[in-house]
Amino acid sequence: MFTLHISAKAQTENLTVITNTKGAPEELKFSDLRSILMGEKQRWRNGNKIMIALMKTNTAAGNSICKKIYDMSSDELKKFWLALVFDGKSDGPVFLNSAAEVQSYVAENPGAIGVTDQQQEINDTHIVLIDGKKAF
């Protein structure tokens, strides 16, 4: 059982940020990424609206996103976003079932940013370096 826990943790340790090729920079500091994903920054420099795509919090990658980026539990993250949306401060993220769905959403929406557990680029997306690294 201990071995399985380590294996599952190793699979979700590395997260990758992808963006649509229209609007987003090719590199971000982790602090800037966190600001974007907290809804504090709403537009890219070119004026495109930032749209956030995340893995559902009941997935291993989604749980890792909650901990590594937001420093929250999945329930805390849901409450955080409900409050922001209710107060009209930000549009909430789109929560998707798989890395493939996140990649498709990001590819189809200029200004979109997504976090997945896979280092893969598809048409109209690119991997954003976070503090100079492809994965964190």
Residue ranges and their predicted role:
Residues 10-136:
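Flexible loop/hinge segments at secondary-structure junctions
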Residues 1-7:
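C-terminal segment of classical bacterial N-terminal signal peptides
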